[in-house]
Design a protein with these regions (language model features):
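Beta-rich nucleic-acid/ligand-interaction surfaces
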Residues: 162-167
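Long, charged/polar, surface-exposed segments that mediate recognition or autoinhibition
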Residues: 94-161
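Post-signal-peptide N-terminal segment of Sec-exported extracytoplasmic proteins
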Residues: 43-81
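Sec-dependent bacterial lipoprotein signal peptides
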Residues: 1-23
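Bacterial signal peptide processing site
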Residues: 25-28
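Extracytoplasmic beta-rich ectodomain segments of secreted or membrane-anchored proteins
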Residues: 72, 83-104
Length: 197
């Protein structure tokens, strides 16, 4: 009797594992299928923020940042002196709900921009204030990113390195948005065509 119960538990456990693997592979294959489909369209989406573009030189990036700083639209921030700015939150009634954004270009060996990194957090974040957590921030940022970068919707992907991210792919441009910790949300925008590798 005990052996039969043990075998039944093993079957149930085995079935759950197989089901989890199938679901996980399906999401990953959905990501691969969407990436392939978008790259096959040969549409280029190189626009970033502040008239920056994938494919610009590193010097162009610094010149734009210099002008933005001169116009007092950005400041040199605390995170490795990356440019920073404050965004108004949709939930402006909550104290501390403005969002601090820092950003930096990703460059190849030829000093050509191949991507863009951004970090966000609520200015009033504290560990005990769940309203200003990265979970809530990520949901809000998805809407903002869709406005900044119109096109396809976000979908969730669990990558092999235990990274769970919201992904948006439009042509050659992939946007990953994910929680770094309870405070920060990271956004990484990259050219997936390999043109700037």
């Amino acid at each position: 009797m005990k052996k039969q119960n043990f075998l039944n538990l093993n079957r149930i456990f085995f079935t759950i594992i197989i089901f989890s693997l199938i679901v996980g592979c399906h999401r990953k294959s959905e990501y691969s299928a969407i990436l392939t489909r978008e790259l096959e369209k040969k549409n280029e989406f190189n626009d970033l923020i502040f008239d920056m573009k994938i494919g610009q030189s590193r010097q162009d990036y610094f010149d734009i940042c210099y002008q933005l700083n001169k116009q007092k639209k950005i400041i040199s921030g605390a995170r490795s002196l990356n440019p920073e700015l404050i965004l108004k939150s949709k939930n402006g009634s909550t104290k501390g709900s403005n969002i601090k954004m820092s950003f930096n270009g990703i460059f190849n060996e030829k000093k050509t921009m191949r991507g863009f990194e951004m970090r966000f957090y609520f200015t009033g974040w504290s560990n005990w204030n769940k309203d200003l957590s990265s979970e809530n921030l990520l949901a809000q940022l998805k809407d903002t990113l869709k406005r900044w970068f119109p096109g396809n919707d976000f979908f969730k992907v669990n990558f092999e390195n235990n990274l769970s991210a919201e992904v948006k792919i439009d042509g050659n441009r992939r946007i990953l948005a994910y929680k770094v910790n309870s405070k920060d949300v990271a956004v990484r925008i990259e050219d997936m065509s390999g043109k700037y590798d």
